[in-house]
UniProtKB/Swiss-Prot annotation:
Keyword Cell division among UniProt keywords: no
Domain of life of the native organism: Bacteria
Record-linked InterPro entries: Ribosomal_uL22, Ribosomal_uL22_bac/chlpt-type, Ribosomal_uL22_bac/org-type, Ribosomal_uL22_CS, Ribosomal_uL22_sf
Protein name (Swiss-Prot/TrEMBL): Large ribosomal subunit protein uL22
Keywords, alphabetical: Ribonucleoprotein, Ribosomal protein, RNA-binding, rRNA-binding
GO MF terms held by the record: rRNA binding; structural constituent of ribosome
GO BP: any one term: translation
Organism listed in the record: Trichlorobacter lovleyi (strain ATCC BAA-1151 / DSM 17278 / SZ)
GO cellular component: cytosolic large ribosomal subunit
Gene that encodes the chain: rplV
Protein's job: This protein binds specifically to 23S rRNA; its binding is stimulated by other ribosomal proteins, e.g. L4, L17, and L20. It is important during the early stages of 50S assembly. It makes multiple contacts with different domains of the 23S rRNA in the assembled 50S subunit and ribosome.
HAMAP family, per database record: Ribosomal_uL22_B
Known partners and oligomeric status: Part of the 50S ribosomal subunit.
Length: 113
């Protein structure tokens, strides 16, 4: 049985978040939670909360053994980019880009590819 969780418009860079997501892809749920809990990245804390949400969704669906769950798919897509301007010298302005991410996690209890 599969369970999923999604997060839209997270104020994280997709490029930096993908590196953390690659660490837990395909791993067991306990190993993934332990890995994310010891990483100092802000994106690791967001992914940790998202994984816990997916586990809670699995419990609501009636999965009996949570320890058999593993991260089937996890992917990070780019979201809308917030654009801000900063005043510069001689009346100019520079653009500041604040990227956002859409993160999706799917947990499964059977290892079928």
């Amino acid at each position: 049985m599969e369970s999923s969780a999604k997060l839209s418009l997270a104020r994280l860079s997709p490029r930096k978040t993908r590196t953390v997501a690659d660490l837990v892809r395909g791993k067991g749920i306990q190993q993934a939670l332990n890995t994310l809990s010891f990483l100092p990245n802000p994106s690791a804390q967001i992914l940790l909360k998202l994984l816990k949400s997916a586990v809670a969704n699995a419990e609501q669906k009636g999965v009996n053994d949570i320890d058999k769950l593993f991260v089937k798919t996890i992917f990070v897509d780019g979201g809308a980019v917030l654009k801000r301007f900063v005043p510069r010298a001689m009346g100019r302005a520079s653009k500041i880009r604040k990227p956002t991410s859409h993160i999706s996690v799917v947990l499964s209890d059977t290892k079928t590819r």
